[in-house]
């Protein structure tokens, strides 16, 4: 465990922010830097079958140290950080023995407050790693990367019985492309766990069904003084579209298993406007209904427009709820829960109000629930992780490997 914090701080010092709307994978050069560093560290650690694909998927194998028909299992994390907030020049703060109250983030007015983030009340006495208020931290998912690397070092340096352990580090998870170029057959695991969750004890096997909705609106611009009966204001049409979307079904008004419509961006002029929504729902039927609703709204608002003016709507599914694939293999969850209990952690089964690479991988034939990392408040300046939570994640990874070996012997 002595190098866990050192690894994490090294990884977050590299800017690996991914970029949406880019064809190449990985979408940024910074991700390659971390992937090459990890490849070198895996080689130095003595892992075998190390490959780094042209699409930035890094895979490696820790050979089994016991005989028997033991299934090969995998652990996966992503190297990119969210494009939602800057990941450049990350300057972590280490708060040892947190005693409660506000934590100043850097030298400005930014604070990490238990008033806004009550979970801090549960973390008294722990070591917190925060931002300086200018960037995100990158615990999502460099905490997971550091935890997997540290677990490998523990397994390599101690006589803990384990079968073949596969590890993978993927790019562009935050922009939904991480798993698209993942070769499940080459990876060679019967099942895997992404290490990409939140607080200690989280074990997730349900996630949103997800789709993106891109709307292009073409209007007609003329001088406002002579516009009657001629102007078609694309911005006004955009406003009408959003007014038809249920206001009480937005991210800021939903929780738990509730789905939502989210207007992520909107830009334009009188002549042309663009809107980008994301749709999320755990229930497949409700998910399909939400997509139909968006089409109906576009038809309603676009009815009767001049032939040269139009509303174009494109819906693209991003990923689906992995529950249906994971529950076919209950032992995957049983082992993870037992590993947590053995590490004195109460498993907390909760739905992911988002997605992970594991969701896509589960539909590609690799059942892949999600383990906690010990991090909180991802994608922004209030992101932080606890050192104790990271250490617990390492213990759980190691224990999963050990329990899987016992199961196969």
Curated annotation (Swiss-Prot):
Residue positions binding Zn(2+) 2: 140, 174, 379
Keywords attached to this entry: Aminopeptidase, Cytoplasm, Hydrolase, Metal-binding, Metalloprotease, Protease, Zinc
Cell compartment(s), UniProt: Cytoplasm
Matching CDD domains: M20_peptT
GO (cellular component) term, any one: cytosol
The keyword Protease appears for this protein: yes
Cofactor(s) required, per the database record: Zn(2+)
Superkingdom of source: Bacteria
Residues of the active site: 80, 173
Gene3D superfamilies named in the record: 3.30.70.360, Zn peptidases
Enzyme class: hydrolase
A Gene Ontology BP annotation from the UniProt entry: proteolysis
Protein EC: 3.4.11.4
Entry function: Cleaves the N-terminal amino acid of tripeptides.
Family, as annotated: Belongs to the peptidase M20B family.
Protein name as it appears in the record: Peptidase T
Lineage of origin: Bacteria, Pseudomonadati, Pseudomonadota, Gammaproteobacteria, Enterobacterales
């Amino acid at each position: 465990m002595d190098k866990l914090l050192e690894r994490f701080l090294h990884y977050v010092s590299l800017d690996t922010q991914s970029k949406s709307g880019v064809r190449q994978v990985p979408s940024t050069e910074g991700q390659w830097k971390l992937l090459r560093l990890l490849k070198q560290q895996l080689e130095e650690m003595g892992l075998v079958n190390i490959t780094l694909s042209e699409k930035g998927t890094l895979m490696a194998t820790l050979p089994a140290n016991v005989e028997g028909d033991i299934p090969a299992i995998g652990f996966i994390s992503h190297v990119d950080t969210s494009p939602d907030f800057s990941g450049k020049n990350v300057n972590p703060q280490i708060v040892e023995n947190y005693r409660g109250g506000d934590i100043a983030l850097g030298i400005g007015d930014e604070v990490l407050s238990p008033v806004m983030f009550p979970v801090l009340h549960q973390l008294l006495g722990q070591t917190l790693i925060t931002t300086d208020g200018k960037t995100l931290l990158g615990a999502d998912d460099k905490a997971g990367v550091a935890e997997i690397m540290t677990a490998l070092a523990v397994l390599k340096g101690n006589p803990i019985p384990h079968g073949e352990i596969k590890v993978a580090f993927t790019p562009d998870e935050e922009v939904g492309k991480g798993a698209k170029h993942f070769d499940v057959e080459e990876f060679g695991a019967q099942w895997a766990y992404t290490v990409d969750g939140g607080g200690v004890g989280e074990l997730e096997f349900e996630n949103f069904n997800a789709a993106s909705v891109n709307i292009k609106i073409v209007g007609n611009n003329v001088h406002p003084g002579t516009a009657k009966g001629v102007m078609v204001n694309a911005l006004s049409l955009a406003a009408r579209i959003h007014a038809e979307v249920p206001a009480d079904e937005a991210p800021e008004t939903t929780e738990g298993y509730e789905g939502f419509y989210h207007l992520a961006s909107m830009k334009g002029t009188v002549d042309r406007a663009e809107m980008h929504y994301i749709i999320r729902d755990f229930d497949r039927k409700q998910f399909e209904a939400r997509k139909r609703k968006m089409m109906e709204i576009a038809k309603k608002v676009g009815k009767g427009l001049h032939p040269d003016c139009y509303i174009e709507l494109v819906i693209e599914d991003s990923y689906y709820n992995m529950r249906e694939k994971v529950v076919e293999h209950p032992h995957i969850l049983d082992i993870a829960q037992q590993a947590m209990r053995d590490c004195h952690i109460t498993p907390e089964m909760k739905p992911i109000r988002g997605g992970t690479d594991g969701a896509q991988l589960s539909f590609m034939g690799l059942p892949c629930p999600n383990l906690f990392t010990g991090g909180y408040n991802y994608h922004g300046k209030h992101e932080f992780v606890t050192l104790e939570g990271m250490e617990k994640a390492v213990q759980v990874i190691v224990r999963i490997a050990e329990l899987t070996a016992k199961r196969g012997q």
